[in-house]
């Protein structure tokens, strides 16, 4: 165990985590990513697009709170768990409704809060995509997946080494 602990300590030191600068860099990347997601959601809302949430997950609630999103930004979150219907997200107080109810609202974008289930969601929700809907995946990089041809639009022309996307929307 001592050898593994020593390896871990060396890796932390080599990556700058022995000093506050290493943590400052992580904080700065997280804040930049948050700012870019806030900007994208704001621009989409300002252009008249309807954005709803998809999946009332714990990870998603952390993201909603960190970004400061409210029901003004995301009016409702689609969920499959009936126990959550009629409830609200912690702190941000965004209402949670059934997926069927939210999809009937014909949102232009669904902000995916359990983004780690990306592949399963894209397979499961082909009908939504084929009918013109788009998924907005906030992490690990901001990514928009749109309909018919499963074109992917990214929030940037590239994702930098830290995993943060920068720039504007483009379609490939």
Locate each region found by the language model.
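Intrinsically disordered, low-complexity segments enriched in glycine/proline and serine/threonine
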Residues: 34, 82, 151-153
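Flexible, polar/low-complexity N-terminal or interdomain linker segments that lie immediately upstream
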Residues: 18-46
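Non-catalytic N-terminal targeting/anchoring module and adjacent flexible stem/linker
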Residues: 118-124, 130-172
